[in-house]
Amino acid sequence: MESNIILVVILGISIVGKATSVAISVAALLILKLLGLDKYIFPYLNDKGMFWGLVLLTAAILIPIAQGNVKAIDIKNNLVSFVGITALVLSFLTTYLSGVGLRYLTVQGHSDVMPSLILGSVAAAAFLGGVPVGPLITSGILALLVKMVKKS
């Protein structure tokens, strides 16, 4: 019951904060719980959900290439530009941070910080016009900061 209340609070905040993807996700989880399907679907989502979410996100990002809107010459020209090189470096960094964050949340068992990560993402979406896709990167930064503080 407590988990339902927490999810409803996150749902309300995400609706007010106009974080539609978070609201849909929370609503889907609540519906699955209310229908009693959580015991069947949650284990699969817990195990494979992140992978399939990343597959869909990556596929969506690659659509312009698949549609032929991006040519090989465009990629070549971009890769040698300041923006292209910066994109490569930042992509390398954020991908690394996402991996650190995923391990921090799952393997290291710090999933209790997820509500704070979600609320921060929702607040940024509401007040700064952001898109709430950064909890893994945020948790990666958090994991590195926690590690540095513990060493001090």
From Swiss-Prot:
The answer to whether the entry has keyword Membrane is yes
Q: Where in the cell is it found?
A: Cell membrane
Cellular component terms per the entry's GO annotation: plasma membrane
Which keywords does UniProt give here? Cell membrane, Membrane, Transmembrane, Transmembrane helix
Pfam families in the cross-refs? DUF441
In what way does this protein cross or attach to the membrane? Multi-pass membrane protein
The superkingdom of the source organism is Bacteria
Coiled coil region boundaries: none
Annotated transmembrane regions: 5-25, 50-70, 82-102, 117-137
Q: Which family does it belong to?
A: Belongs to the UPF0756 family.
Principal place of residence: membrane
* Protein's recorded name: UPF0756 membrane protein CA_C0092
Query: Which organism is this protein's natural source?
Result: Clostridium acetobutylicum (strain ATCC 824 / DSM 792 / JCM 1419 / IAM 19013 / LMG 5710 / NBRC 13948 / NRRL B-527 / VKM B-1787 / 2291 / W)
